[in-house]
From Swiss-Prot:
Superkingdom per UniProt: Eukaryota
Protein name: Beta-toxin KAaH1
Signal peptide coordinates: 1-22
Cellular location(s): Secreted
Keyword Disulfide bond carried by entry: yes
Disulfide bonds: 40-63, 49-68, 53-70
Free-text function comment from the UniProt entry: Inhibits the vertebrate potassium channels Kv1.1/KCNA1 and Kv1.3/KCNA3 in vitro with an IC(50) of 5.3 nM and 50.0 nM respectively.
Record lineage: Eukaryota, Metazoa, Ecdysozoa, Arthropoda, Chelicerata
Gene Ontology terms, MF aspect: ion channel inhibitor activity; potassium channel inhibitor activity; sodium channel inhibitor activity; toxin activity
Comment block on domains: Has the structural arrangement of an alpha-helix connected to antiparallel beta-sheets by disulfide bonds (CS-alpha/beta).
Further facts: Negative results: is a weak beta toxin because it has no effect on Nav1.2a/SCN2A voltage-dependent sodium channels when perfused at a concentration of 100 nM, but when added to the extracellular bath solution at a concentration of 1 uM it shifts the voltage of activation toward more negative potentials. Has no effect on the Nav1.5/SCN5A voltage-dependent sodium channel. Administration to mice produces no toxic effects.
Gene Ontology annotations for the cellular component aspect, listed alphabetically: extracellular region
Protein family membership: Belongs to the long (3 C-C) scorpion toxin superfamily. Sodium/Potassium channel inhibitor family.
Amino acid sequence: MMKLMLFSIIVILFSLIGSIHGADVPGNYPLDSSDDTYLCAPLGENPFCIKICRKHGVKYGYCYAFQCWCEYLEDKNVKI
């Protein structure tokens, strides 16, 4: 029981440290030619969003809030 409690405390501490010092990666929602965001599902890593982000000139993206989000997408590259 004591080992389980100690393990749980360690996991919680590492989770807190990761959320405090975690990298906040900049990015943007890419827009199509009609100034609309690209809708997506399922949430998380999504092949469609990765493809869209590559069209916008960045390497990685994912589905967040049912819209594609591209990491490191600058404001000037948002619209195709």
